[in-house]
Amino acid sequence: MLTGVTDGIFCCLLGTPPNAVGPLESVESSDGYTFVEVKPGRVLRVKHAGPAPAAAPPPPSSASSDAAQGDLSGLVRCQRRITVYRNGRLLVENLGRAPRADLLHGQNGSGEPPAALEVELADPAGSDGRLAPGSAGSGSGSGSGGRRRRARRPKRTIHIDCEKRITSCKGAQADVVLFFIHGVGGSLAIWKEQLDFFVRLGYEVVAPDLAGHGASSAPQVAAAYTFYALAEDMRAIFKRYAKKRNVLIGHSYGVSFCTFLAHEYPDLVHKVIMINGGGPTALEPSFCSIFNMPTCVLHCLSPCLAWSFLKAGFARQGAKEKQLLKEGNAFNVSSFVLRAMMSGQYWPEGDEVYHAELTVPVLLVHGMHDKFVPVEEDQRMAEILLLAFLKLIDEGSHMVMLECPETVNTLLHEFLLWEPEPSPKALPEPLPAPPEDKK
């Protein structure tokens, strides 16, 4: 089926006039998928589904105290100062009150963020950064106090002071779109349970296959699988389907693209959900990885790699998990694409400062049996982000959306419906009460 659709796309391309500008918009397939050409010759399969168009809702009633109060719902003030020091440390100061009230039943995350958070930026050589709540002068290190004070010269300071309206995203609302982005080796099929669930609730959903994955085209050039190339693909898909309030849901490597889009389009991204995405560190490929072996060697090792993924990606390794792995097209890519994807994970901008600048509310979901992403990394992400909630799933692993679909669907839906209480600084002065009529 894919070959026929792709051939049709290329025939259309060859049949266009020489002076045609811009790529082909899209081709609809008979099985409900859309093939979008994000660049000439670069075609992504996209699952775009939603409820049938309904009649326009009646206009809201005019003067109403409830409507006036509704205009203030979800309005919060985001205030934060980020200071980067020359000695490689980062100080994050939360100047306002972040809406960290209980989000979910059995919430695992902490209640209130620390007033200040001091971070040692991750060393590109591989040393892990450490988090230490405290003031600018806290922390112990080698050297005398004078040397420490001289080393703590600010390199740059970033001030964040804005108001955001964080509202409940319901399925019946036409301005809400959910974007699902998978990780390395997956496809949009890993989101089947989530896509079906949210479409039944009336949400509009968009789920692309990354290049080289699923039914998308697979260029035989390693440069086609760098982070920046894939991020531009996701930008094109986002700009095509985005509406007023967009929610990004990413898994593993897909979380990095969600972060990128949230940073690029802060006014369009309403909420973000990160599933087993790891810590807030810049991406850099490992030169000692097994994926740096020649493609022919990786091809011979593919059965072993698939078995290793089953062992590390699922809490259990029974017949059910093997079937989920097969049906979800997880870890089902060519050796060339797998090698190029792993070696192309270079994103130096995506460090702690980049994540600390985000003002969008984030739900972090972590499967406790995950052997790819330690829970400490997601905990570190929750501490860096301004508005973050961490939820741990005891029965899940790296592929938690396949293992525990009901639990994941419930968490995601509750987060979509969540709406914070407005902070005092975001509220206007109350209007004076009208004088009472004297009888």
Curated annotation (Swiss-Prot):
Residues 49-70, 124-156 are annotated as: Disordered. One of its GO terms (cellular component) is extracellular exosome. Its EC number is 3.-.-.-. Keywords: Cytoplasm, Hydrolase, Inflammatory response. GO terms for biological process: lipid homeostasis; negative regulation of NLRP3 inflammasome complex assembly; phosphatidic acid biosynthetic process. The active site is at S252 (charge relay system), D370 (charge relay system), H398 (charge relay system). The keyword Phosphoprotein does not apply. Residues 146-156 have a biased composition (Basic residues). Gene3D superfamilies: alpha/beta hydrolase. Its main location: cytoplasm. Residues 177-279 form the AB hydrolase-1 domain. InterPro entries: AB_hydrolase_1, AB_hydrolase_fold, Epox_hydrolase-like. One of its GO terms (molecular function) is carboxylic ester hydrolase activity. It is an enzyme of class 3 (hydrolase). It is found in: Cytoplasm. Residues 136-145 have a biased composition (Gly residues). Negatively regulates NLRP3-driven inflammation. Promotes NLRP3 degradation through the chaperone-mediated autophagy (CMA) pathway, hence attenuating inflammasome activation and IL1B secretion. Acts by recruiting palmitoyltransferase ZDHHC12 to NLRP3, facilitating NLRP3 palmitoylation and subsequent degradation. Interacts with NLRP3 (via NACHT and LLR domains); this interaction is enhanced in the presence of NLRP3 inflammasome inducers, such as ATP, nigericin, silica, or alum. Interacts with ZDHHC12. Belongs to the AB hydrolase superfamily. This is Protein ABHD8. The gene is ABHD8.
